[in-house]
Amino acid sequence: MHLSMDTLGMVDDSGHGIVDSYDMAKGAGSSNGGRVHSIDVILGFTKDQEPLLHSVGDDGSPKVNGALQQDPAKPVPSEPYGNLPELGDSSQHHSYHDSSLFSSDKCEEMSNLTKEVDIADGSPKSIKEEEHGKKKHRRNRTTFTTYQLHELERAFEKSHYPDVYSREELATKVNLPEVRVQVWFQNRRAKWRRQEKMDTSTMKLHDSPMLSFNRPPMPPSVGQVANPMPLDPWLTSPISSATPMHTIPGFMSSPQTLQPTYSSHSFLNSPPGMVQGMQPMGPPAYQCAPPFNDKYPVEDDRNSSIAALRMKAKEHIQSMDKTWQHM
């Protein structure tokens, strides 16, 4: 395969394209009249594919080196884009507006759908609007006077469920609507039920056998602090655990050795003949207390109620005598 020297020498330093070399090689081959091994033949292009090698403009004129080769005999059209449809054609705009896609009914339907979707999703905006609407319809609270509350409480004590006539009469009396009176009775009954339930639960807690186990033990410091505190003389018992039994006048073996230092009251049922040999001390209205008989042992006196009462009376008399002696 041999290339002609004319074809190889056509590429100069200016860097012209393959198209210029192809044109000049074609002209050289045609002038020589021999077989020309051109670039098209080497590359395998045929005559049918020859127009693909040339740049064709809008009007079919070949383009060489990026420029159009205009035929001087062919007139250039003044509007090269005249064959394209006008973008501002009014007929097309009318066709779009006449379609049902942008009609007012469709727009309203779309807006309704968006509202329904917002409500279904529970958007904060819709919730705020609903709350705002509810606040508008809220009724003002009724402020009762002292007289009204007093009359209502009196009626509630008489009957927890007054009838319509009683409520109307009470409403006229306290200058309130009958509906307000009815609502007040409903609230008062609910409060009464709650109070009853609380009282019942409190009673059950007190009666529970497990309550004693749940009580916390008393700290030892409480007993230590409470013991050294002094008491009043009339609150202290004259008979202590350290007092020997033979020093108590009522428990002596013989009634003759009893000294008349204690007075008696009129409510003590003393048998006759037991107060002989005793002289009253202190105020003249009081007499000496009779001694207890030996036939009543200490255990029987503590167990019987009469003996316990006598013991308490005796202790009271002794404490009173001590206070008079200090005076």
From Swiss-Prot:
GO term, biological process aspect, one: regulation of transcription by RNA polymerase II
Region of interest (Disordered), ranges: 52-140
Motif OAR: positions: 304-317
DNA-binding region: 137-196
Pfam families to which the protein is assigned, alphabetical: Homeodomain, OAR
Motif residue range(s): Nuclear localization signal: 310-314
Keyword vocabulary terms for this entry: Developmental protein, DNA-binding, Homeobox, Nucleus, Transcription, Transcription regulation
Subcellular location: Nucleus
GO molecular function, a single term: RNA polymerase II cis-regulatory region sequence-specific DNA binding
Signal peptide interval: none
Motif, Octapeptide motif: chain positions: 37-44
A GO cellular component entry from the record: nucleus
Amino acid composition bias (Basic and acidic residues), ranges on this chain: 52-61
InterPro entries: HD, Homeobox_CS, Homeodomain-like_sf, OAR_dom, RAX/RAX2
Job of this protein: Plays a critical role in eye formation by regulating the initial specification of retinal cells and/or their subsequent proliferation.
Similarity annotation: Belongs to the paired homeobox family. Bicoid subfamily.
Protein name as it appears in the record: Retinal homeobox protein Rx2
Organism: Oryzias latipes
